[in-house]
Design a protein with these regions (language model features):
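Hydrophobic hinge/microswitch elements
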Residues: 78-81, 86-90, 152-213
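Ligand-binding "clamshell"
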Residues: 100-113, 194, 207-217
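Alpha-helical "hinge/linker" immediately C-terminal to small N-terminal DNA-binding modules
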Residues: 5-34, 40
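Secondary-structure junction motif
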Residues: 124-128, 134-170, 238-239, 245
């Protein structure tokens, strides 16, 4: 789930912050003594359930091979702020961001399309179009982690996510019966109940080898989402940080 958005004041201060950090960044000299094979460094990464279930799962396998003593401290968006990332208290944020402070360095890790997940016995698996999709019951994975539990009207959920935003453009609305912020929960519910989960493809493909699960392309267009990593200018020239960013890029490329 996405939980970090800059405040209005933070956005107003972006030019000033960018100038200050730019000067600090230029004074930092690259480190030359980082050795991943022997380092016992801990990297703190703010990330979402989506990135944990896809990218970071593969990253852990690579770390076990090339940097066995490295530790990852994975933090949820609700546990940190942009200020923590900006100060270098958190090594990086990996998530889907609508907007980021200008003081951050950032890079797109990948773009991901969507897929619909359902049990193979679901009627939709054999007769699948927009009409039958809308008649089915759905699981909604919250973009922000907020749902009806905090007073949001279920009839207005189309304002909160990519899937429902596109349905709204078509003048349509789906029947959502479960709200969750966890992709694994959505996948398990889709497997055991007669509900449909429309998820980013890389998360949906966790169940590719499960004979009870069927994946379908959505019966309407949904723009791809961008998974990004963002980090402080204070860490931009850090040798260990540079190594981790490159490793993440390599892992992401292999997953394309």
């Amino acid at each position: 789930s996405d939980g970090m958005t800059p405040t209005k004041r933070a956005l107003e201060l972006q030019p000033v912050i960018r100038d200050v950090l730019s000067k600090l960044e230029s004074s930092i000299q690259p480190e030359t003594d980082f050795n991943p094979a022997t380092s016992s460094r801990t990297f703190r990464i703010m990330t979402s359930d989506y990135a944990e279930s896809t990218l970071l799962l593969e990253l852990l396998g690579r770390l076990a091979d090339c940097a066995p003593n490295i530790t990852l401290d994975l933090i949820t968006p609700s546990d940190v702020t942009f200020h923590d990332v900006e100060q270098g208290k958190v090594d990086m944020a990996i998530n889907r961001f609508d907007e980021l402070p200008l003081s951050f360095h950032q890079k797109v890790i990948w773009y991901d399309n969507f897929a619909c997940v359902m049990h193979r016995s679901h009627p939709l698996a054999s007769h699948y179009d927009l009409e039958t999709y809308l008649k089915a019951q759905h699981i909604w994975v919250s973009k922000t982690g907020f749902g009806v539990g905090v007073g949001i009207d279920p009839n207005e959920v189309q304002k909160l996510g990519w899937v429902d935003a596109e349905l709204t453009k078509l003048g349509k609305q789906r029947d959502i019966r479960v709200f969750t912020r966890h992709y694994h929960a959505a996948l398990q519910i889709a497997k055991r109940q007669s509900l449909i989960a429309t998820l980013p493809s890389k998360a949906a493909k966790i169940f590719t080898d499960d004979p009870d699960i069927v994946l379908r392309e959505p019966p309407f267009d949904i723009p791809p989402i961008a998974l990004k990593m963002a980090w402080s200018a204070l860490l931009h020239h850090d040798a260990g940080h540079i190594w981790l960013r490159r490793l993440i890029g390599d892992v992401a490329a292999e997953m394309q």
